């Protein structure tokens, strides 16, 4: 863990809250000791519930290095990632997550992260399979493409 890198994530969060962009969430993506991506919560300014600090930092890092893979990178974030951000971190191939506040801290100031974690196992009633055969045809078509890039 590097204090300087966490301080940079905190600066990102401050930038966001001081400019009215969203909540107190900032993040930096780091590879080989160098910051390759920065982001802060932009939910309010973009009117987009997916613009969390971690997701914004991942998007920035991917643009900066020209790849959707962030393998070998770490992320420093001001709060424990919500399930959506955790999914993005895993999809990006990020190795380690260093965070400041946890889900209980976020809940205390009005954010619902803990609720999402607590209800993940109860979502089966909302996951309703439909038209699987047609979707499997799409998968087969994609799988036979010579220029496909698995990720």
Can you describe what each PLM-predicted range is?
Residues 1-18, 81, 88-151:
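Zinc-dependent deaminase
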Residues 21-25, 71:
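Short, basic and Ser/Thr-rich N-terminal targeting/leader segments
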Residues 24-33:
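Short beta-strand scaffold segments in enzyme catalytic cores
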Residues 36-43:
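Short beta->alpha transition motifs characteristic of CBS
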Residues 47-88:
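Helix-adjacent hinge/juxtasegments
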